């Protein structure tokens, strides 16, 4: 039941790719002004030259006499009623700015979303921004840990530690991102109902940045699950291998590393202290990663001892042949 090394590295690469994708999407959505899009209902200006309003003029004399007066006052009447008296301008809003079309000239007018937010909702907006920054920061930390595990780690114990910390960072960042998205949605809905009269949207919907943020959250949680799965498989493989090593001594299972050292002491130096492994004597293992470090180093020591004993064995064999 060993875990193939290539399979483990593939899962680590998948976690790193998902984390990088989540980091890119979350950064793009944070900087975008397309969280919400819609239209604003703006009254048309009064009748005048160059304006598209449907108006007609009725001259009214100033002295109240007939229509042939020398200086009549002109009264403007419009045929438009209902929604025809308004224009609908497109607008877009994000965490930083809210921009809308203007009637006088082509272009947009942008205002700070913080200024549009009601005073009672500004604290929630600041919390939302803080959660978004923490979300991106933890994602960046998780990506660095996964990249370090892929490129520079050959020690299985260190790999376990990096995988565990990367998974925890991904989970925390995903939770903070979810909270930040929900808080900003609540702030926008309150601003749409209680904001300035000249800004309140007539109709609005979610923009591409909103969906991008939730896709980023999904990728972040998928990366966390994949990293946790890799960590669990490594731990199970470690336990399986070393349970086979101590299957012959069932009474020593609670403290199998100490019993293993005692067996080495008895087999290597009967009746004497252990001289080959002085640094491992009576050291309890407090975690899985320490156990992996312990057995990895112990295995290296055994290989070194075996390689040093081979020349002695060959020399002894040659001396016997000469005799």
Swiss-Prot record:
Q: Where is this region: Disordered?
A: 302-323
Domain of life, per lineage? Eukaryota
Please give an example of a GO cellular component term from this record.
plasma membrane
Q: Which Pfam families match?
A: GSG-1
Q: Is the Membrane keyword given for this protein?
A: yes
- List the subcellular locations: Endoplasmic reticulum membrane
Does the keyword Membrane feature in the UniProt annotation? yes
As for membrane topology, the entry says: Multi-pass membrane protein
Spell out where the chain crosses the membrane: 17-37, 133-153, 164-184, 208-228
Q: Mainly resides where? A: endoplasmic reticulum
Alphabetical list of InterPro entries matching this protein: GSG-1, PMP-22/EMP/MP20-like
Q: Which UniProt keywords apply?
A: Endoplasmic reticulum, Membrane, Transmembrane, Transmembrane helix
Family classification: Belongs to the GSG1 family.
Function, in words: May cause the redistribution of PAPOLB from the cytosol to the endoplasmic reticulum.
Query: Tell me, how does this one assemble?
Result: Interacts with PAPOLB.
Q: What is the recorded name of this protein?
A: Germ cell-specific gene 1 protein
UniProt organism field? Bos taurus (Bovine)
Name of encoding gene: GSG1
């Amino acid at each position: 039941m060993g875990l193939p090394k290539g399979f483990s590295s593939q899962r680590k690469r998948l976690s790193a790719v998902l984390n990088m994708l989540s980091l890119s999407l979350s950064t793009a959505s944070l900087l975008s002004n397309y969280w919400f899009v819609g239209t604003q209902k703006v009254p048309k200006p009064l009748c005048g030259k160059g304006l598209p309003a449907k108006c007609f003029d009725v001259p009214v004399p100033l002295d109240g006499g007939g229509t042939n007066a020398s200086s009549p006052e002109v009264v403007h009447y419009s045929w438009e009623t209902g929604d025809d008296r308004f224009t609908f301008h497109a607008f877009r809003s994000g965490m930083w700015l809210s921009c809308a079309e203007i009637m006088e000239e082509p272009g947009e007018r942008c205002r700070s979303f913080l200024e549009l937010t009601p005073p009672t909702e500004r604290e929630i907006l600041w919390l939302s921004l803080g959660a978004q920054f923490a979300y991106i920061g933890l994602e960046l930390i998780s990506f660095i840990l996964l990249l370090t595990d892929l490129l520079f780690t050959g020690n299985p114990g260190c790999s376990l530690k990096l995988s565990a910390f990367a998974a925890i960072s991904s989970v925390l960042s995903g939770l903070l991102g979810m909270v930040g998205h929900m808080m900003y949605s609540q702030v926008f809905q309150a601003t749409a109902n209680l904001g300035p009269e000249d800004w309140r949207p007539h109709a609005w919907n979610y923009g591409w940045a909103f969906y991008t943020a939730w896709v980023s959250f999904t990728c972040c949680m998928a990366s966390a699950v994949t990293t946790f799965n890799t960590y669990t498989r490594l731990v199970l493989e470690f336990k399986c291998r070393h349970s086979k090593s101590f299957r012959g001594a069932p009474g020593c299972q609670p403290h199998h590393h100490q019993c293993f050292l005692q067996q080495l002491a008895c087999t290597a130096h009967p009746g004497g202290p252990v001289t080959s492994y002085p640094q491992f004597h009576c050291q309890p293992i407090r975690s899985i990663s320490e156990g992996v470090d312990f057995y990895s180093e112990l295995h290296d020591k055994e290989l070194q001892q075996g390689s040093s004993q081979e020349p002695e064995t060959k020399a002894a064999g040659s001396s016997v042949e000469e005799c």
